[in-house]
Regions:
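Short coil/turn segments at secondary-structure boundaries
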Residues: 2-5, 22, 47
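Active-site SXXK
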Residues: 1-11, 80-88
Length: 195
């Protein structure tokens, strides 16, 4: 949505949206590299010492790529988390607000959340840990940006319908849907879109 409204350029360096990342590797890693997991080898998860909001930016500042941006795809929550974080920066809102107050309502999703509100917790699915105790996605650095939204079955159907037939959506949302349907990076017969 940020790209469709002209607030985010997928080709721009990541450092354009977060000056603290400027003067180094993120001047050569694009927003698109982050959105397609081709930033240069960010790990699957943040290391424990950086898995919090206080240390995540310094982690990115100190991180060293394993390969050139755009040359290899490696799934990474920090990579997609930074993509979401910079997208929110471009919209000048926290990601939760950008999603829950702007984008999700434009898609007609009334029971979809980045952070499930207390009034909906009884409907929020859970898994079980090795100890048999209930578990859900835990908090961590860029969790809202990387771990996805929580939705109801009826909203999931609305989301699928919006993606199959976006003609009823406002024009910026139609463009956003189209951007997410575009393949940007191909490897081993698979084409990667955003996220």
């Amino acid at each position: 949505y940020a790209a469709a409204t002209g607030k985010l350029k997928l080709s721009a360096p990541a450092s354009d949206y977060l000056p603290a990342l400027g003067g180094g590797k993120f001047d050569h890693i694009s927003i698109l590299n982050l959105g397609t997991y081709t930033a240069g080898g960010l790990p699957l998860q943040f290391p424990p010492e950086a898995d919090n909001n206080q240390h995540m930016i310094s982690y990115f500042q100190q991180w060293k790529p394993d390969f050139a941006p755009g040359t290899q795809r490696l799934y990474s929550n920090p990579c997609l988390g930074l993509f979401g974080y910079l997208t929110a920066q471009s919209l000048k809102q926290p990601i939760d607000q950008a999603m829950e107050k702007n984008l999700l309502p434009k898609l007609g999703l009334k029971h979809t959340f980045v952070k499930v509100p207390p009034s909906q917790m009884s409907l929020y699915a859970q898994g079980y840990g090795k100890d048999g105790k209930p578990v859900r996605v835990g908090p961590g650095a860029m969790d809202s940006e990387a771990y996805g939204i929580k939705t109801s079955a009826s909203d999931l159907l609305r989301y699928v319908q919006a993606n199959m037939n976006p003609a009823k959506l406002e024009s910026a949302v139609q463009r956003a849907v189209s951007i997410t349907h575009t393949g940007y990076y191909t490897v081993d017969g698979m084409t990667q879109g955003l996220g």
